Amino acid sequence: CRFWEPKTGARLGIVFEETVVDATAIDPRGCADISTWLALPDPIEYMRGITELAERSKNRLHIRELEHAPAPGSRHLLPPIDKQEIWGAGVTYQRMRQSHVDESHGGKLFYDEVYDAARPELFFKTTPHRVAGPFGSIRVRSDSEWTIPEPELTVLLSPAQRIIGFT
């Protein structure tokens, strides 16, 4: 996870059930931020080593200490990205197809093509500074009459285009 420590700023953490160990405290260079970690030659193997060290750490936070709205003077969870762009892959849930057609007012042809395409439609979503973290506020356009909640699969890629993880 990423979390905010008021005295030191953004940190990477390793979650063990209901506790969090500060990985940045274990290795300030390799765990400086997500971008630094992803750029390592083998981020997965590196994190295995950090996790072994973290398992022995007595210095733990309870996850509840981080689970509240962001505030500069208190510890809180941050979005799980730092410098990465966010991209989406098509309209992938068949169940959402009609909702998207209805919402787009005449976008039937576009959404039919997205659903029936040989590969998913890739589209740019946002930059990191626009991402709301856990317990953060989201912005909805004032002219929006409704919002469609959708489940999402997130895939984390390294700069070398290796799949590092997913949620």
Predicted regions, residues:
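Gly/serine-rich nucleotide phosphate-binding loop at the start of the catalytic core
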Residues: 1-43, 48
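Active-site microenvironments in enzyme catalytic cores
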Residues: 45-167
